[in-house]
Curated annotation (Swiss-Prot):
Function: Involved in transport of proteins into the mitochondrion.
Gene Ontology terms: cellular component: cytoplasm; mitochondrion; SAM complex
Lineage of the organism: Eukaryota, Metazoa, Ecdysozoa, Nematoda, Chromadorea
Domain of life: Eukaryota
InterPro entries, sorted: Glutathione-S-Trfase_C_sf, Metaxin_GST, Mito_Protein_Transport_Metaxin, Sam37/metaxin_N
Protein name as it appears in the record: Metaxin-2 homolog
Location(s) in or outside the cell: Mitochondrion outer membrane
Disruption phenotype: Knockout animals show abnormal mitochondrial morphology. Mutant worms display developmental delay, with almost none reaching the young adult state.
Family stated for the protein in its record: Belongs to the metaxin family.
Entry's Gene Ontology BP terms: mitochondrion organization; protein transport
Known partners and oligomeric status: Associates with the mitochondrial contact site and cristae organizing system (MICOS) complex (also known as MINOS or MitOS complex).
Keywords: Membrane, Mitochondrion, Mitochondrion outer membrane, Protein transport, Transport
Amino acid sequence: MSSSGVITQLVTDALSMNAAQDWEDVSLFTPYLNDQALMYDFADCLAVQTFLRMTSLPFNVRQRPNVDFISPDGVVPLLKINKTLITGFNAIVDFVHKKGVTLTSHLSETQVADMRANISMIEHLLTTVEKFVLWNHDETYDKVTKLRYGSVYHWPLSSVLPFVKRRKILEELSDKDWDTKTMDEVGEQADKVFRALSAQLGSQKYLTGDLPTEADALLFGHMYTLITVR
C-alpha cells in the first residue's frame, strides 16, 4: 500500500471510531462565501449545508479566510465536531452515515448505486470543469479567480498565493489529461453531465423519486452556484 493509501486508511479508521461521539458543538468552517470562495468550493459548502439541513442535524457556519490552510488536506468545507475534523462533501456524508443518519433508507440497492454514480459524476467531472474554467482559462483567472482567491490577503500574498494555487490545480488537470482540452471540449463535458442528470430527473421531484438524497444536495449546490455566479 502506498503512503497516501496508508494515510487515507488511518483517517478512515479514526473517523469510524469518532463517529460514536455525540453531535454537539458542531461547526462548519468555510471560506468567505460572498467574497473569497471559488465556484467549486462555494458549491460544496452549500451542498454540505443543504445535506445537514436535510438530516436536521444542528450546526453553525463559521467563515474564515484561511480554511484551506486549516484543513488537513486543503479541502473545504471543514466540519468540526468536538476535536474531530472532517473535510469535503463525501467525507462529511460518510461520517454522518456512520452515526446512523442517512437519506437513503427508502432506496433500493440499485437506486443507491445510481445515487453514488451521480455524486461521482458531479464531484469528478463537473468539479473538474469548474476548476478548468477558473484556473486554466487565462481571462477568467485574471479577472475573477486571482482576485477572489487573493482578496483576503495583503500584498504580496494576494499575488503569490493565487500563483501557487494555480500551479497546483494545473498539475491536477494535467494528471487527468485535461491540460490540453479546449473550452469547447470542456463545455461538451459539462453538457454531458447536465444531460445525464436531466434524463434521470425527468418529471420526478428529485433524482431518485419523491424524497431528496445527498446527491440532490450536491446537485443543488452546484446548480445554484452556476446559475447565480457573477
